[in-house]
Amino acid sequence: MKATFVLHGWWRTS
């Protein structure tokens, strides 16, 4: 699932 990765990735790195 790419959506979950992005959703939990952009705010993690921000």
Curated annotation (Swiss-Prot):
Q: Which Pfam families match?
A: Leader_Trp
Superkingdom: Bacteria
**UniProt keyword list:** Amino-acid biosynthesis, Aromatic amino acid biosynthesis, Leader peptide, Tryptophan biosynthesis
Against InterPro entries, the record matches this protein to: Leader_Trp_op
Would the keyword Amino-acid biosynthesis turn up in this protein's UniProt record? yes
Q: Which GO terms describe its biological process?
A: L-tryptophan biosynthetic process
Q: What does this protein do?
A: This protein is involved in control of the biosynthesis of tryptophan.
* Name of the protein in its database record: trp operon leader peptide
Organism, by scientific name, is Citrobacter freundii
